[in-house]
Amino acid sequence: MEPWIETYRGAVSPWETDVTEHFTVAFYFDRIAMAEASLAAELGLGETLRAGGFARRYDVRYARELRAGSAFHIESAALSTEAGVRLGHRFVDSVTGEAITWFDVHWDGVAATVPDSRIAGDWDGPEFETRADPKDLARLIPTAAGRVQPGDLDEFGRMGICGIVHKFTDSSVQIGAAIGLTADYIKTGRRGFSTFEFRVRVAAESVGLGDIYRNRTGIAHLGNSSLRFLHVMSDPKTGREIARLGQFGVTLDLDKRRPAGLAPELRERAERLVLPT
Amino acid sequence: MPWIETYRGAASPWECDVTEHFTLAFYVDRIAMAEATLAEGLGLLGMLREGGFARRYDVRLARELRAGSAFHIESAATRGDGSLRLGHRVVDSVSGEVATWFDGYWDGVDAKPPAEGLARWNGPDFAPRPEPTDLARLIPSMAGRVQPGDLDEFGRMGLAGMVHKFSDAAVQFGAAIGLTADYIKTARRSFSAFELRLRIARSPGLGEAYRIDTGLAHLGNTSLRYLHVMRDPTTGREIARADRYGVQLDLDARRPAPLAPELRERAQRLLLPMG
């Protein structure tokens, strides 16, 4: 058995694309949840994943877009079992054979034994530099709230990574609207927000059906065309953090598919939401 | 705690319909969450979980939400004597305007929130509408079985699951009068609801069969009223009904547009006798 195995193959459905007119990030995670479970089963870690109870980190680099009708597959491998389990996944455009998105995943504190022959030594994904999160989260604004619904659950009956990212996507729409990147502006101005990097942190204690969540968001970086949103999902009853996402992206010219500078009126609004770092 | 925020999020593109706006069933998907959160705040979540009472929802859709719209929901108990009345307002998070009102009733539930917990309802009044005297002329518009994706957090067919089926019934009924997918695409006309009266007698469970029959309860110049009745096909027992008032919409001008003569002619044949 090769270290790299194919863990998913399929396509992008038109209803899985967003207002930026490409495959929306939450559906990448829908597929990664499957890929992760298939890889775990292959490595003899299926029950570890099912039992849960450990924190997970997903560092993601989106290098090229997938759009409605794109055919793609996922290749996955264990990268390390030192100081926790590290798994790699790469999304491959099934037409060109190019790797277009990388997921560098850590299961924190999980002690596992995997044969050396199953550890891939040829990870070709990017290095993820450390990004400082703001110390003071008091200026985050409310961006999502709701209850965990049946469609949010994963195959293990907990709120899944796809469900979590869908809520963060709602938060992204809300913070976008707060700085003027509204549905109307996107449609008439032909500008959207396109993500190139994700840092997802999921706490060890998961949430289940009917549990309440609240998301709050701030801006951790504001460049010429680039923005980094910090979203924090928590339990409003206890204040316990459920997950957080650092979302790095650019405002995109929807026709040229290239980064575009923020309009002055949007920049002014965004500046008010920048967090102290 | 009169009005509390019970949901915050956005309309996704895949939640929009051929009328190119946020489809009704997804409003209701969010209202189901808002209702459960409000019930929890009022100490009534156990009652909602248990079910066994009829529910009514009178809905006024005042402004459209479209793909990428940011919105939130504010909810409150508005009456507690005899039947519990719960109000929800769907607010455009950008403009702060109320886009949609939901006036909900739990029939026969004699829960009495404290007086200071009751809010004043500032939504529209919903006047009674004439009812058809004979449902024999309804036509079949939907049939299926309750699937896992139709269930709510309590394991029964949820509000959103039901309204999705009524939306299918509306598409079928629209096609029967000539408002077909091709016509919508080429003529740039579609049906847009501005009012919904939803009555739920009971909530079926996984694998139960249902069928919906539909008729026309009103035909105006631009306006139509669809009446959908969902039943258990084995017993004939009513599960729910949806009374949907709307207009034919010019998809570009986003304004009501009169029905074309050939569609009007077909629609007239499906009019129900009214009391």
Model-derived features: positions:
Chain B
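Hot-dog-fold acyl-thioester-processing enzymes
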Residues: 1-56, 100-195, 250-275
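HotDog/MaoC-like acyl-thioester-processing domains
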Residues: 6-7, 58-70, 76-138, 200, ...
